[in-house]
Amino acid sequence: MKFLLIGLIRFYQYAISPLIGPRCRFYPSCSHYTLEAIRVHGALRGGYLGARRLLRCHPWHPGGYDPVPERQEQACACHRTAKPGK
């Protein structure tokens, strides 16, 4: 699924985007943001972040710099290593 989404975004970037020109109000552009979000967070969460970004990309939003949030590791108690002596 991840590679399919990346392929679709790459197709858009190389085949469609040059025809319509730069229109994104953000840096990085929405397609680059979504591509990076999928690479960092996976298809489900990255796709969600990309969709939220696309919904904010409209003439009434000021835009600006909006990086992909860093991945936060969520470790449950069962995966934590026990400290020696405890």
Curated annotation (Swiss-Prot):
User: GO CC annotations?
Assistant: plasma membrane
**Where is the protein localized?**
Cell inner membrane
- State the taxonomy lineage: Bacteria, Pseudomonadati, Pseudomonadota, Gammaproteobacteria, Pseudomonadales
Which InterPro entries has this protein been placed in?
A: Membr_insert_effic_factor_YidD
Q: Which family does it belong to?
A: Belongs to the UPF0161 family.
**One matching Pfam family, short form?**
YidD
> Which superkingdom, per the lineage?
Bacteria
UniProt keywords (A-Z) are: Cell inner membrane, Cell membrane, Membrane
Job of this protein: Could be involved in insertion of integral membrane proteins into the membrane.
Q: Kindly give the membrane topology term recorded for this protein.
A: Peripheral membrane protein
Question: Could you tell me what this protein is called?
Answer: Putative membrane protein insertion efficiency factor
